[in-house]
Amino acid sequence: MQPFNGILFCIHGFLGQASDWELTIPLELRWKSIDLFSKEALVPSPLDFRSFGEAIQKNVGDLPCPRVLVGYSLGGRIALHMLVEKPEIWSAAVIIGAHPGLSDEGERLRRIDGDERWAKRFEVEEWDTVLSDWNSQTVLIGSPNIERKESDFSRKTLADSLRGCSLGKQKDLREQIGKLRLPILWIVGEEDLKFLSIAKQLKKLNPRITLVVIPKAGHRAPWDQPEFFKKCLIEFLTINES
């Protein structure tokens, strides 16, 4: 088997930075990412899944093939929207700890309300307090917190993304994911039980999904176990080189 000669385009999660991927991508691989929440970021308007995807797409056009789309958490949800919109420009995808969308209207409304509360907090509250509370959410417990400086972020963009890209406003993409024909590596941490259950359901919908459960890892699986993640990535890309 030949080594992977393409490029990865990586989309970070909420409160993420492009540099986060440096800890998780093997040195021999080429990759690109952009900061979505920095004060210098070119923020689309209105800020939602479609506009985020279109803004990211502008950074993809000149990249060599094969191209592999990688997305973590919120970045994974953005990546899923991009895949169902224009699957033909990607050779494969790696989705990490991402939700395909809610099907229950009551859940949608509750999530929108919850994200609105977080958005207001990120707009006005003391940075260290809201950051600590964010990292104390059940889904993130068990993973080491990554240092985040207020000066590296636009509070307005963070708040706007919580509103515009709320899980409550996301389409339920299960049907479209089931129809995707490109190979997908779906990564989830062993201790991330909610997302592990979701990933198993999606694997049943699409035989092109390769599900990998990273042991001793939570929602931030690639950063909890970077060497294991690198190994999985290399194996997947080598097998699916095209």
Model-based region annotation:
Residues G71-G75, A79:
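Gly/Ala-rich beta-loop-alpha elbow adjacent to hydrolase catalytic centers
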Residues V84, W90-F122:
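Flexible "cap/lid" loop of the alpha/beta hydrolase fold
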Residues I146-Q176:
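Hydrophobic, aromatic-rich cap/lid helix
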